[in-house]
Swiss-Prot record:
Disulfide bridge positions per record: none
Record gene name: plsY
Membrane topology: Multi-pass membrane protein
Organism: Bradyrhizobium sp. (strain BTAi1 / ATCC BAA-1182)
Keywords, in A-Z order: Cell inner membrane, Cell membrane, Lipid biosynthesis, Lipid metabolism, Membrane, Phospholipid biosynthesis, Phospholipid metabolism, Transferase, Transmembrane, Transmembrane helix
Protein name: Glycerol-3-phosphate acyltransferase
Gene Ontology terms: biological process: phospholipid biosynthetic process
EC number of the protein: 2.3.1.275
């Protein structure tokens, strides 16, 4: 199979990896309440943290990131750099819209980082540094994610990584869409801050 013919396969590989709901799996194994019935109902690490189980939240964050990295590396090995990028897109879509959960998944921050690690790891370091700085300054996890994701494709483009910049610009648009409720709460002044007691 040639590199171009492999691209649809890479998309499927990425989607299947991305659709693994680590947050839901880990919380069920730990015997906690169904993740979809608490907090935001989201299956990501932030909502897992609302169970009070920091270890589970860390495991979810790691699992969600690594599934993006794994999809990219495996597809890149089998089909080359274009396949790696397509797999990254597939992993992101799988995380956001997993078929097993009626297309209701996470918001994409951890898998965004994982895809960056697989495709261009310095970009992942940049994303994390921006996230940390923004979270420290404003104490909003959602703001930190939005700022880091908007700046990442700009920096990739500025350093000549135009194909990666285009991919991550698309992922950023999807990530912003998934944070639309957070944006509404920010506008209303009701978004919860990091460390705030609910």
């Amino acid at each position: 199979m040639g590199p171009e013919a492999f691209l649809p396969v890479a998309l499927i590989i990425g989607y299947l990896f991305g659709s693994i709901p680590f947050g839901l799996i880990l919380t069920k194994l730990a015997g906690t309440q169904d993740l979809r019935s608490i907090g935001s109902g989201n299956i990501g690490a932030t909502n897992v943290l609302r169970t009070g189980r920091k270890g589970l939240a860390a495991g979810t964050l790691l699992g969600d990131a690594l599934k993006g990295t794994a999809a990219v590396i495996i597809s890149g090995y089998l089909g080359g750099p274009n396949a790696a990028m397509i797999a990254g897109l597939g992993a992101f879509l799988g995380h956001l819209f997993p078929v097993w959960l009626k297309f209701r998944g996470g918001k994409g921050v951890a898998v965004y980082i994982g895809i960056l690690i697989g495709l261009f790891w310095p970009g992942a370091i940049f994303f994390c540094l921006v996230w940390l700085a923004t979270a420290f300054a404003f104490r909003y996890s959602s703001v930190a994610a939005l700022v880091a994701s908007v700046l990442t494709p700009i920096v990739l483009w500025a350093f000549g990584h135009t194909a990666l910049a285009a991919l991550f610009a698309l992922l950023t648009l999807l990530l912003i869409y998934m944070h639309r409720e957070n944006i509404r709460r920010l506008q209303a002044g009701t978004e919860g801050k990091i460390g705030a007691k609910k």
